[in-house]
Structures are given as C-alpha cells and as structure tokens.
C-alpha cells in the first residue's frame, strides 16, 4: 500500500486514460456535429447514490474476480466500462459543445448551460473512481492481498 512508484505509475496511467477518453469523445462529437443532448447524457451530469452504488457493485465484482484464478479478469474491465467511461465521454461532449449546447428535456429545451454538462459528469467520474478505488482496497484487504504495514 505504500509503493510510491506503483502509485505514480497508476496515476499517470489513469491520467492518460482520462485524456484519451475525453479527447476521443470531444473529437467524435465535434466531427458528428452534435448540437443537442438527450436524457442519457444529461442523466450523467448530476451524481446520485444510485450511480455510486453501481460503481461500488462493479468494483466488488471486478476486484473479487482478480483474486480468483477461475474467474475472468475481464470483469474488472467491465467495471471500468460501466462506471468510468460514460461520464468521461459526456465530459468530452460537454467540452465540445461549450455554451452553445441545448439540452432536450421531454418536449422542452434548455439553452445556455455553459459547461455544467462537462463539470457535472466529471464530478460523477471522480465519485465513481474514488468509490471503485476504496471498495477495491477493502475487497483486497478482506481477501488478504495486502496489509497496512
């Protein structure tokens, strides 16, 4: 738990991953000319306990699968795909649209959201990342894969 080199390497990897996903989502939304947001995107702009619960459940499944040889390690990848990638993609879309976005809510629209979409979805990403990290730490400690020494 105190391996500074591994922590730095992990932080750099996560940072590059975040930049890659946000950058790719921005380029694709710019290239496709996205001009309005549907409920799937706006739903990822305000974190709630259900989102955190999904991230924690995915973390339990993913980290537990890594402690068992008979279980596939791809479950950990599914945890990332479910909890981390969607909010990062929404952040990229929000950054591309900037203050010119229009969100569609049912029959009405709301214009001029500035970057609330990007900020809210990035907050969801951070909450999910922290939830996955802490939950995985607990699962690994319960499975005796480390100590506080």
List each model region and its residues.
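Membrane-embedded alpha-helical segments of integral membrane proteins
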Residues: 91-92, 116-144
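Pore- and pathway-forming membrane helices of multi-pass small-molecule/ion transporters and channels
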Residues: 1, 52-106, 131-137
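Transmembrane helix-bundle signature of multi-pass membrane transporters/permeases
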Residues: 14-18, 48, 60, 79-87, ...
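Alpha-helical transmembrane segments and their membrane-interface boundaries
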Residues: 1-59, 69-72, 117
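Peri-membrane helix termini and adjoining interfacial loops of integral membrane proteins
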Residues: 30-36, 99-109
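Membrane-water interface at transmembrane helix exits
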Residues: 24-33, 62, 66, 93, ...
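Structural signal for the N-terminal portions of transmembrane helices
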Residues: 9, 79, 107-130, 149
């Amino acid at each position: 738990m105190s391996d500074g080199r591994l922590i730095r390497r992990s932080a750099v990897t996560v940072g590059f991953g975040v930049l890659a996903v946000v950058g790719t989502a921005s380029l694709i939304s710019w290239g496709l000319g996205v001009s309005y947001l549907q409920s799937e995107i706006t739903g990822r702009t305000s974190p709630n306990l259900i989102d955190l619960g999904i991230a924690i459940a995915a973390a339990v499944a993913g980290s537990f699968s890594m402690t068992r040889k008979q279980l596939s390690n791809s479950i950990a990848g599914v945890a990332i795909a479910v909890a981390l990638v969607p909010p990062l993609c929404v952040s990229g879309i929000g950054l591309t649209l900037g203050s010119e976005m229009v969100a569609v809510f049912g029959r009405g629209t709301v214009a001029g959201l500035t970057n609330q979409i990007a900020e809210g979805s990035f907050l969801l990403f951070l909450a999910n990342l922290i939830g996955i990290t802490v939950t995985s730490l607990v699962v690994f400690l319960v499975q005796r894969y480390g100590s506080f020494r």
